[in-house]
C-alpha cells in the first residue's frame, strides 16, 4: 500500500483516558490521517466499525472492556482491520495475548509519539500490500 493510500484510511482510536485520546487524535491528524475517536470499546461497537483499509489503535487497559476483548468482538464481527495496541503494561502476558489475537504492533506508553505513526503505517502495509 502506497503512502498516499495509507493516508486515505481512517484510523479508529479507542482509548479511555481523554487526555491520551486527544493527543493520539492530534498526532495522527497532523500526519494526514482521517481519525475517529472512541472513549471505550462499547462506544466503538455501537457507533461504527472499521472497514477495509482502515486501522485500529486500541488501548490495552480500559475500564469497560479491555483491548483484547474488543479485538475478539471485532474479529467475531469479521472486522479484519489491522490493530496497533497501546499499553503501559508491557510483558510476556501482553505479548502472548497480542500474538494470539493477531496483533503484530505494540506501542508503549508514555512514548507513543516516538513510534505510533511508524507502527500504524507498517500495520496497514502488512494488511494491504501493494
Segments predicted by a language model, with ranges:
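Two-component/phosphorelay signaling modules centered on CheY-like receiver
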Residues: 18-36
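Acidic, metal-coordinating helix/loop segments flanking the phosphotransfer/catalytic sites
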Residues: 37-55
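A Lys-centered signature of the CheY-like receiver
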Residues: 109-110
Amino acid at each position: 500500500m502506497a503512502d498516499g493510500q495509507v493516508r486515505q484510511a481512517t484510523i479508529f482510536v479507542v482509548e479511555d483516558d481523554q487526555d491520551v485520546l486527544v493527543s493520539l487524535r492530534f498526532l495522527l491528524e497532523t500526519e494526514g490521517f482521517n481519525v475517529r475517536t472512541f472513549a471505550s470499546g462499547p462506544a466503538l461497537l455501537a457507533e461504527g466499525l472499521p472497514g477495509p483499509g482502515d486501522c485500529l489503535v486500541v488501548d490495552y487497559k480500559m475500564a469497560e472492556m479491555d483491548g483484547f476483548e474488543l479485538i475478539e468482538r471485532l474479529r467475531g464481527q469479521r472486522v479484519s482491520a489491522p490493530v496497533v495496541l497501546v499499553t503501559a503494561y508491557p510483558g510476556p502476558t501482553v505479548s502472548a495475548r497480542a500474538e494470539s489475537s493477531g496483533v503484530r504492533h505494540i506501542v508503549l506508553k508514555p512514548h507513543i509519539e516516538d513510534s505510533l505513526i511508524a507502527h500504524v503505517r507498517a500495520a496497514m502495509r502488512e494488511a494491504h500490500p501493494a
